[in-house]
Amino acid sequence: MAEPGTPILVAVAWPYASGSRHLGHLAGAYLPADVFARYQRLAGNRVLMVSGSDVHGTPITVRADAEGVTPADIVDRYHAEFLDAWERLAISWDCYTSTGTDNHAAVTHDIFLRLLEKGHIDKRTSEQFYDAEADRFLPDRYIGGTCPHCGYLEARGDQCEDCGRTLDPEELVDPRSKITGATPELRATEHFYLRLSDFTESLGAWLDGREGWRRHVLNFSKGWVEEGLQDRAITRDLDWGVALPVDDLGEGKKIYVWFEAVIGYLSAAKEWAQRSGDPEAWREWWEGDDARSVYFIGKDNIPFHTIIWPAMLTGYGGLNLPTDVPANQYLTFK
């Protein structure tokens, strides 16, 4: 139980601005977070509840392609819909924003450059899937296939929604392009990588010290570390996303969504501070020794919040890691 007056960051999953939210989203992340935030405010704690629309995910470009409109058209439609829904549900945000702001890009660039400077990001040439019929490289969500771990036939190129494992597209069995249905080929391309392997020991020790976490969250996270953390590409061959703060890779590259979306919790806190009239106020929730941070997400986002984001925070230095990540299971109807 937090002492009265404790700064508590309530960090809530960022919905893709690619489609309407459903009951599972509300029950899994948004209503629990709002109940928790309201209780903590009544208990006398200083709550900062933040989230926003994720406007750079490939589900957005996939939908835009299908409808024959621009990604910005899709984003504008669903961001407005989300804002209306939160107002009607009376969700008590302190800051609900989007990853499309100049502020978010600036905070993302700051973290990218610090990690690059400290050697936790490096540049590599790798082979990625290319659709010769469409004449383009394929981001993860533009590829489907069979999960190599559980055999699920409709796995995505970034994750299997059946077993929850994150994937690299080249791991898929019988991969296919979602644009043309063709079998993609591997071609060389240059990208920046986050050296997750640098944090194996520190994250393992941190997870061992977590108390009160939900068992499925802790076991899943520890399993990642025990299997050995793999370095992951953090840029993609895309024209929709946060621009790189360096020009090493040339044209046609963007920071990939899984790297920059989690930074939204920090950029939203900074945006709130700027709006409040004290641009440094965010530090109370992110740097204070007594501060707590609780992340409300669905189970499919566990590794991004218990492995990747803590690794980024550790590498950056001076920012608080999550206190708890009470990820919910999927809501099912029978």
Name these PLM-found stretches:
Residues R41, E87, L116:
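Anion (oxyanion) recognition and catalysis
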Residues S53-P59, R63:
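Short, charge-patterned binding micro-sites
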Residues H79-D94:
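A glycine-rich helix N-cap at a beta->alpha junction
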Residues G119-H191:
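Cys/His-rich short segments
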Residues A2-S51, S98, N103-V107, C150, ...:
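Structured secondary-structure scaffolds
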Residues R63-D76:
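A charged helix-plus-loop insertion that forms the helical arch/lid used to bind
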Residues D73-R77, W93-A106, A132-C150:
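Aromatic/His-enriched, Gly/Pro-containing loop or helix-boundary segments
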Residues A105-K123:
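Hydrophobic or amphipathic alpha-helical targeting/insertion segments
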